[in-house]
Swiss-Prot record:
PANTHER family: L-THREONINE 3-DEHYDROGENASE (PTHR43401:SF2)
Active-site positions on this chain: 40 (charge relay system), 43 (charge relay system)
Stated name of the protein: L-threonine 3-dehydrogenase
Classification via SMART domains: PKS_ER
Residue numbers marked as site, Important for catalytic activity for the proton relay mechanism but does not participate directly in the coordination of zinc atom: 148
Cofactor annotation remark: Binds 2 Zn(2+) ions per subunit.
GN (gene name): tdh
A GO biological-process term: L-threonine catabolic process to glycine
Catalytic activity entry: L-threonine + NAD(+) = (2S)-2-amino-3-oxobutanoate + NADH + H(+)
Length: 341
């Protein structure tokens, strides 16, 4: 079968042929319809330090997908051939304390599809049936293909009560922009998002952000005055991993504010702990999606009118994958879909 794989320890992704995967007793085989390119895939493509220390070579990559089940293992129940599914890309052990307590997103032994094991950029993918998630008929393949990053946005945005709150989002990449849409959908008052990329700020505006701020030209505190904010933001969603963005967020939070962090700052990031301690801030780290509460929330929001369709800006046939990666790397895109049909 055809796959997109990391074949060499250097920049790039290559199309290759590999044997059709076998179906285990508790697995499902999924014929892939569409995939999306993730920021993680771009790290693997660029072959940066993280990728060099993490990714085995050769390996099929990719973890954002939708497809149709073509085979089910003999021990599988609840799924059948023909079911349209996406899937949770974090494979957990099922035996540790967190897994047994229903906190599978905190499993210490998590393996990532397309990171630590064979990925979804392929004609067929095998995953444990417990990681598959059925897609309702009124949700499109394009939407289902981005459930992984949509889930990151959902998990982050819904970590704290947003009703009537003023929300600051740092980082207007696809996940940040989707978080803006979610925050408005669930009842936030002001949703302000910061970045230095005008294309992505414009996209965040289309997604529902109250105010976008290019911090290379505007002061966030001036914008707070403009929109009649006097006490600071109630909730912060840190999506950028940028040290300066995080420090700015801390300065602009209200006393008693809450921050959910999905972005990964540098290991040596310096912050003013006075901002955290004397403001009584709560900071929560976010990894992946809650299994599977986040997935049900995503479906419920889409079915109740949440529109995140503007986040998909480009679509390519899988044979045009190089254009897809070039587009994603340009900074002038939202989500990029690869069609495997």
């Amino acid at each position: 079968m055809k796959t997109l794989a990391k074949l060499h320890a250097e920049k790039g992704i290559w199309m290759t042929d590999v044997p059709h995967p076998d179906c285990g007793h508790n697995d499902v085989v999924i014929k892939i319809s569409k995939t999306a390119i993730c920021g993680t895939d771009m790290h693997i493509y660029q072959w940066d330090d993280w990728a060099q220390n993490t990714i085995p070579v050769p390996m099929t990559v990719g973890h954002e997908f939708v497809g149709v089940i073509t085979e089910v293992g003999p021990e599988v129940s609840g799924f059948k051939i023909g079911d349209r599914v996406s899937g949770e890309g974090h494979i957990t052990c099922g035996h540790c304390r967190n897994c047994r307590a229903g906190r599978r997103h905190l499993c210490r032994k998590t393996l990532g599809v397309g990171v630590n094991r064979t990925g979804a950029f392929a004609e067929y993918l095998v995953i444990p049936a417990s990681n598959a998630f059925k897609i309702p008929n009124n949700i499109s393949d394009d939407m289902a293909a981005i459930f992984d990053p949509f889930g990151n946005a959902t998990h982050t945005a819904l970590s704290f009560d947003l009703i009537g709150e003023d929300v600051l989002i740092t980082g207007a990449g696809p996940i940040g922009a989707m978080a803006a849409a979610i925050a408005k959908h669930v009842g936030a008052r002001n949703v302000v998002i910061t970045d230095v990329n005008d294309f992505r700020l414009d996209l965040a505006k289309k997604m529902g952000a109250t105010r976008t701020v290019n911090v290379s030209r505007e002061s966030l505190k001036d914008v707070m005055t403009e929109i009649d904010m006097h006490e600071g933001f109630d909730v912060g969603l840190e999506m950028s991993g940028n040290d300066m963005a995080f420090r700015s967020m801390l300065e602009c939070m209200n006393h008693g504010g809450k921050i959910a962090m999905l972005g990964i700052p540098g290991k040596d990031t310096l912050i003013d702990w006075n901002q955290v301690i004397f403001k009584g801030l709560i900071i929560k780290g976010i990894y992946g999606r809650e299994m599977y509460e986040t997935w049900y929330k995503m479906v419920a929001m889409l079915q109740s009118g949440l529109d995140i369709s503007p986040i998909i800006t480009h679509r390519f046939k899988v044979d045009e994958f190089q254009q897809g990666f070039d587009t994603m790397g340009s900074g002038l895109s939202g989500k990029v879909i690869l069609d495997w049909n």
